[in-house]
Structures are given as structure tokens and as C-alpha cells.
Amino acid sequence: LVQHHWVVVAQVEQQIVGYVIAGRWGFFEHWPIYRTLLNRLPQLDWDGPKLTKTNSCQYGPIWVQQTYRGQGIFEALVSEIRRQVAPHFSYMLTFIAEDNERSFAAHSGKAHMQVVDFFTVSARDYYLMAAKTQA
């Protein structure tokens, strides 16, 4: 993963307090949820160009240690991973479980991601969210 994709780590005094990954679809498409997501891309109707395997990558997971939340680490991680993938992809995509309200709020607010689809896998509902990698 590290050699062919992207990993950003946040450290405080040599302790890892957060991380985020992003990767090409070839790494993820072996899992059923990603196959479902990718199969839905051609049918998406949203305000941007068609999202494809070649103009987008999978973003996430992202994690920030609970005691460091609310200190700008989430935003810094998103900003840095966005900067790193921008030369390769126009969009980052992620999915968030409908019942994960904190993650949805962080991604729609702080990460400026937009809901582009809603889907169900194994009786669980998810938002598919997208963000441009460049302003």
C-alpha cells in the first residue's frame, strides 16, 4: 500500500495521533463494497463530470485519536492527502455509513465533500461522497 498509494500520518512528540490513506481502485476493488461502489459510478447524476476509475481514487479511512480531535488534525490530514493525490486524480471518493453522523458531519463540513449517491450493501446504508482534489 505505502509504495503504490498514499498514507499521511499525524504525529505529536513521535506518537501517531492520526492517519489517512488514499489508493487507486485496483487495490480496493477486490472487496464487495468497492465493487458495488464502482459499478454505480456510470449511473451517477450529480453536478460534476462523470466519476470514473481513472479520474478518482478511494480516500479513507481517516482516523484521529480521540484526545486530539477538534484541534485541526482532521483538516490537515485531508488537505495533505488531497495535495498528494491531486497530480494523479481529479476526485477523491469515500463512503460513510448512514449511522456514522460524526464522520458525515466532518466530511461534509470540514473536508467539503459532497454526497453523490446513497447505496446499500449487506443491509447497511452508505453515503458515497466526492471531493475535488484541486480548488
Residue spans for each PLM region:
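Conserved acyl-donor/pantetheine-binding loop and adjacent beta-alpha core of acyl/acetyltransferases
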Residues: 21-61
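Conserved acetyl-CoA-binding loop-helix of GNAT-fold acetyltransferases
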Residues: 61-64, 70-83, 109
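Conserved active-site alpha-helix within GNAT-family acetyltransferase domains
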Residues: 75, 84, 98-117
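Conserved catalytic-core motifs of GNAT/GCN5-like acyltransferases
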Residues: 95, 111-128
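Short hydrophobic/aromatic beta-strand element in the GNAT-like acyltransferase core
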Residues: 5-9, 19, 56, 61, ...
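Conserved beta-strand-loop-alpha-helix junction that forms the acyl-donor binding cleft
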Residues: 62-69, 94-104
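Conserved beta-hairpin
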Residues: 5-20, 35-39
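Conserved GNAT acetyl-CoA-binding A-motif
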Residues: 55-57, 85-97
